[in-house]
Every structure is written in C-alpha cells, then in structure tokens.
Design a protein with these regions (language model features):
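Short beta-strand or tight-loop elements
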Residues: 57-59, 108
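Short beta-strand-centered aromatic/proline hotspots
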Residues: 60, 71-83
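Short alpha-helix capping/helix-loop boundary micro-motifs
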Residues: 40-51
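Contiguous surface segments at macromolecular interaction interfaces
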Residues: 1-29, 36-37, 44, 85-144
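Short polar/acidic secondary-structure junctions
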Residues: 66-68
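Short, well-ordered loop/turn sites that connect or cap secondary structure elements
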Residues: 52-56
Length: 144
C-alpha cells in the first residue's frame, strides 16, 4: 500500500465516495493536477451533512465506481474539509440547484487527493461475502 501524504491521526475516519464512470472516473482524478480535485455536485442531504460536518483533513475514502461494473477502484485522502459548493448556484453548471438562494449554496464539497489505485476492483459481490462489512450502507438494498 502506498504511503499517505500525512501521518495517521487517532480520529481518522473512512468514507465511500461514489461516482459514475461517465460523470467522473478514477482516471479523471488520477490525471487532475497534483491528482487532486474538489468533490462537487453532491445533492443528497445526508451526504452533504457528512461532507460539511464530519469529513476531516486526513480522512481516507474508497473511490467507488457505480454503473455497469460497480466496485472500489482506489483510495483517496481528504485534503480540504467541507466548504460551500459553488456549482449549486451557477445556472450554467450541470450541478446547478435552483433551490440554492442567490450566491448562498446550501451544498458542500471537499477536496480529495488520489492516493492509490487498487490492483483490481473490489466488487459488490465480493464485499457481500465479508461478514465484517455486513452493516455497510452500500451493501443494503436501495443504497447504491
């Protein structure tokens, strides 16, 4: 496993970031400047709250491709904590949300850095065989 860019801290949390490969893929992140980008366009209140209130710099996340061949592709690190997502208030952006008032975005985003691509994808079917992952929301019906 590759080294993480900052020392582990005792309160590190682990997250799952899902993206459709046609919208934003692992390769898009890997090819971004410094392998870093913002995780924008999230329009789910629970996910927004996690990004805004709980994701901390140094936390790690699994990068999950949804779609035809779903699975965990790589590991990312949160490098900037939650802040307002300006795509929500830009009418020209595909993530525009007319419910956001004026320049005030009700949505949040974090910045992430690609740490490591896994040697092979970890599939949903494989995750379902692991008893220690039984309570993982991703594995529950209706959570994908």
């Amino acid at each position: 496993m590759a080294q993480v860019t900052r020392p582990a801290h005792k309160d590190r949390q682990y997250w799952l970031l899902k993206s459709d490969t046609e919208t934003f893929s692992w390769d898009d992140l890997w090819n971004a400047p410094n392998r870093t980008t913002h995780w924008d366009g999230v329009r789910n209140f629970q996910a927004r709250n996690y990004m805004r209130d709980e994701m901390k710099k140094g936390d790690l996340a699994f990068f999950y491709h949804s779609g035809e061949n779903p699975g965990i592709i790589g590991i990312v690190e949160v490098v900037r904590e939650g802040y307002p997502d300006p795509t929500a208030v830009d009418p020209k952006d595909p993530h525009y949300d007319p419910r956001s008032k004026g320049a005030e975005s009700q949505w949040s985003m974090v910045d992430i850095h690609a740490v490591e691509k896994l040697p092979r994808p970890v599939t949903l079917a494989e995750m379902r065989t692991k008893p220690e992952l039984e309570g993982m929301p991703l594995l529950k019906k209706g959570q994908r």
